[in-house]
Regions:
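Cysteine-centered motifs
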Residues: 2, 12-14
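N-terminal, positively charged regions that mediate nucleic acid binding
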Residues: 25-66
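Glycine-rich, mobile lid/loop segments that gate access to catalytic sites or pores
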Residues: 32, 92, 99-282
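Short, charge-patterned binding micro-sites
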Residues: 66-84
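Short glycine/threonine-rich loop-to-helix capping motif typified by GTGT followed
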Residues: 81-88, 276-295
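Conserved mixed alpha/beta catalytic, RNA-binding, or beta-rich assembly cores of soluble enzyme
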Residues: 250, 290-314
Length: 314
């Protein structure tokens, strides 16, 4: 009679067989998250729209505001619908936001003092307003819905997943240097993007930092000398920025965290700084920005890179 434990596997012990026990090998995996700076063209638009909404709600808490923004070389375009008893100076608000971000020089191709501002914001349709303006709070509607997903985690004190928290913090430190300690990296301009890749164990514990990618806009602070090509000058600029990132920026990033996270940086991680070689033309001058394309960066989540976004640099 066949043994039950083997017949359950579809194997008869009456036959000559070899059975190999297979042990599942542990397998680590890589997890990547991305952040963009306040000077990224899409985030410029988000911040302008935020400021318009905030100003109107401050003036009239019952305001209903839909505001979309497009920013490109030398130009900001606003469109949307508003129902409010408040007033906001669109022109002044836009220039204040752009100035605060750091676009304050004509050499950037987009600056607070000279950019054109076109506003096509108009009254909200009364037909739409009927659906979103109710006297009873429990009957209050919403014009649009957005769906995001994510999770809280104990990886960081603020419950953010570690990869996205590191990506955010790297750019916050970069912005602090640019605005408050410019002598350290005097060539910095506002636009930047970061990516952090972490190796995790198969039971989802961070093992080490695998890769740090930072693209940061900069002045053209090295020009070709005699018998030197433009490529040589570009290479020298990129190397200077990489050296500063390694010696100044990353130590500041690491210092923000406790010893357990600091230990993840002790391995031989890969560092890519301005991997295209040069990033002088940036911000809305180099890449048109639109509201709503960086919602994922604002959400409290980290997502594995599962596909590529078509068109532009994303």
């Amino acid at each position: 009679m066949c043994a039950p434990s083997l017949t359950n596997l579809g194997v008869c012990p009456c036959e000559t067989i070899n059975i190999r026990l297979i042990k599942k090998e542990s397998m680590s995996y890589l997890f990547t998250s991305e952040s963009v700076s306040e000077g990224h063209p899409d985030k410029v638009c988000d911040q302008i729209a935020d400021a318009i909404v905030d100003s109107l709600i401050a003036a009239d808490p019952q305001s209903k505001v839909a505001c979309e923004v497009l920013a490109t070389r030398g130009q900001v375009v606003l469109a949307g619908e508003v129902r409010s008893q408040g007033y906001v100076d669109i022109d002044a608000t836009v220039r204040r936001v752009v100035e605060g971000i750091g676009y304050n020089q004509a050499a950037y191709g987009f600056d607070a003092h000279s950019c054109g501002i076109l506003s096509a914001i108009h009254d909200q349709s009364p037909d739409i307003n009927r659906g979103v303006d109710r006297s009873a709070p429990e009957e209050q509607g919403a014009g649009d819905q957005g769906l995001m997903f994510g999770y809280a985690t104990r990886e960081t004190p603020n419950y953010m997943p570690l990869a996205i928290d590191l990506a955010h913090s790297l750019l916050l430190e970069l912005a602090h240097i640019r605005k408050h300690e410019p002598s350290l990296m005097p060539y910095l301009r506002p636009d930047a993007k970061s990516q952090i890749t972490i190796e995790y164990s198969d039971d989802h514990h961070p093992l080490r930092i695998d890769t740090i990618v930072l693209s940061t806009q900069h002045d053209e602070f090295i020009t070709p000398e005699k018998r030197q090509s433009q490529d040589d000058a570009d290479s020298a600029m990129r190397q200077r920025i990489e050296d500063d990132v390694r010696s100044l920026l990353i130590p500041r990033l690491v210092a923000r965290y406790d010893a357990s996270i600091q230990a993840l940086f002790q391995g031989d991680y890969k560092l890519f700084v301005n991997p295209t070689g040069k990033f002088v033309i940036g911000g809305p001058s180099g890449d048109t920005g639109v509201t709503g394309r960086k919602i994922i960066v604002d959400a409290d989540l980290a997502l594995e890179l599962a596909g590529r976004k078509t068109g532009g640099r994303g």
